[in-house]
Amino acid sequence: MTPQSSPSSSRDHVCLVCQDFASGYHYGVPSCVGCKTFFRRTIMKKQKYICQFEGNCPVDKTIRCACRYCRFEKCLSVGMDRNALQQNRDPIGYTKRTRRPKKELKTTSDCSSDEGASTPPSVSPLQLSPPPISPLLFQAAPLKPRRCILQTLAEREKCANDLRLSEYLPIRSLHEALCSKALLNDTAFLEKWGQPSERHQIFDLRFVNHDDYHYWHERDWFLLTEYAKTFDVFEALDYQDKAELVRHAAITVPVLVQVWNSPDYGPDTIVFPDGAYFDRTPEPTRPAGLNRKKYQMLDLVLKPFRDLQLDATEFAAFKAVTFLNPDADISLPARKLVNNERVRITKQLYGYMAMKDDVDTAIERFARLVLMGTSMSKMACESKEAVWIADFFENIGFSAFARQLFFGDTTSVVAHKL
């Protein structure tokens, strides 16, 4: 009995590996000719592949040739059975009757494997040429966890929000905040302080005042410093680079937190956890630049967030990418470290979105998210300029911590160096 089913049954299936049209049942599962051929060649030639990334590349009909390692892992995970191959009935390569002229081999690409062509082992940079491989390598096994980084970020975000809603808000300098232990990694601390305060519950809505802005910005800046310390790459930086990276994110990350955690009371309303809210209502007592920031939050962040309908995992990853910005005024070695971590998370985010939606939808949502980051960077530059102007004219009474965050803390830097 051959692995392939009758042609009539193939119309009812798609390929479980790449979601293309299945030509029938091959090696136990519905699959297309390309994935069937790829799986057979991998087993028969005892080929071994490696992934250039983290073993979580998307595999579908549009990019199934991108990573052979992840494609083969997908074949195994959906149930393709290597024992279904028959040595005498599954030859690899061309017979005398079907052998192609040599001149055509020159144009054979890696992706031609989907048409049943035999690709020379030396073509792919992902392919190794080791001694014969142990059969244990090909035993069916589940794929590596695809969301390990994103799951960590999502869990971290939940802890951060629990702390945001608690009573805990220490008074400390920026240097103390950045050099102390990471509270979000302290299980005992979170068990003690991770309960929501009665103050941070919505009983009724009231229009925001200056004290509300001050209170919630202080809380979100405190959370920003704690959030930063959860990244290993951040802890590897020297103090000056840490301070500059946090300073660069002092507008964008709190904006994301405030928008994401706001209950939906309409398209132009952001609500804090205690019921204070702001909308497009003019606030003549606030500096013009900060009023402009309010409108930008509604237009550039709130509306796109609601349109994209991000889930908690996507938000946590986007927040991390926003924070890990190599455009901050940090040293070159720090910039390389931060950028590498940012790229790593960005790849995971795209892979997650590609698994969640069809390819076209995933690409569109990912592109809109990236463009939103660009708009937020522009908003942050304008808002920081507004903060400097407000401080110059003494329109706002900044706390000592806020002044150190926005304008620098030379005393702490000197003390750190000593």
Swiss-Prot record:
Molecular function terms from GO: nuclear receptor activity; RNA polymerase II cis-regulatory region sequence-specific DNA binding; zinc ion binding
Domain NR LBD: residue ranges: 170-409
Region (Disordered): 89-130
GO cellular component: nucleus
DNA-binding region coordinates: 12-87
Keyword Transcription regulation: yes
Cell compartments where the protein resides: Nucleus
BP term (GO), one: S-adenosylmethionine cycle
Tissue specificity remark: Expressed in germ and intestinal cells and at low levels in the hypodermis.
Annotated InterPro entries: HNF4-like_DBD, NHR-like_dom_sf, Nucl_hrmn_rcpt_lig-bd, Nuclear_hormone_rcpt_NR2, Nuclear_hrmn_rcpt, Znf_hrmn_rcpt, Znf_NHR/GATA
Zinc finger (NR C4-type): 15-35, 51-70
Tree of life domain: Eukaryota
A Pfam family annotated for this UniProt entry: zf-C4
Region (AF-2): 398-409
Keywords: DNA-binding, Metal-binding, Nucleus, Receptor, Transcription, Transcription regulation, Zinc, Zinc-finger
Entry annotated with the keyword Metal-binding: yes
Phenotypic effect of disruption: No obvious somatic morphological defects in adults. However, shows diet-sensitive sterility arising from germ-cell proliferation defects. Dietary supplementation of L-tryptophan, but not the D isomer, to E.coli B strains suppresses sterility; this effect requires live bacteria. Sterility when fed E.coli B strain OP50 can be rescued by dietary supplementation of either vitamin B12, methionine or choline.
Function, as annotated: Probable transcription factor which may have a role in detoxifying dietary metabolites arising from bacterial tryptophan metabolism. Required for fertility and involved in proper postembryonic germline development, especially germline stem cell (GSC) proliferation. Required for activation of the methionine/S-adenosylmethionine (Met/SAM) cycle in response to low levels of SAM.
Similarity annotation: Belongs to the nuclear hormone receptor family.
Protein name (record): Nuclear hormone receptor 114
Species for this entry: Caenorhabditis elegans
